Amino acid sequence: MEQTQNPNNQRRVISLLVDNSNGVLARVASLFCRRGFNIDSLTVSATNDPSISRITVTLRGSEQALSQLILQTERLEVTRQVFELDPEKSLQRELLLLKVACNTAERAEMREIATIYKSKIIDLSPDSMVFELTGRPEKINAFLKMFSGYDILELCRPGITALERGGKHQHMQKPAQEVRDAQLPLPGTHCPQ
């Protein structure tokens, strides 16, 4: 029997360009929380413009709920742009640090798995190994599955970071401020209740 994925629970990756100032991350995360979204992962990074930061958020939800969230996020005065990244038109990467208990006999097997997945061994002790792997979330999941039979001591997956493919930014239509200005009533008119 073929399984279909629930469209209301699809993983979605949102990219935000925001002002690089104090409290911005808290405001954005608070909005997501108030709207009932559970954040699966969140990364924040600098951009080539020191006044702008990039926030990449991974969450689950329906297209309709996400569209509403994007509109509300665009209304924040700290938001420059916000959009969903299409998995087929974006580069999404995740980092994994994995510490596994091992004995001498298990080391060769673990090194073989690391070689196949192009993982790095970044620490080695008499009773453990630490691996570093970067790749698509599906690759990270497959790597972890290979280690499911071993004693995993610790792991860290900080979150997905992503950019659109291609030379030009596909979402550079209007700055978010223009969107907000277009939603404000003209002077002398009243806001609808």
Language-model features: where?
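Long, contiguous binding/interaction regions
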Residues: 1-53, 58-193
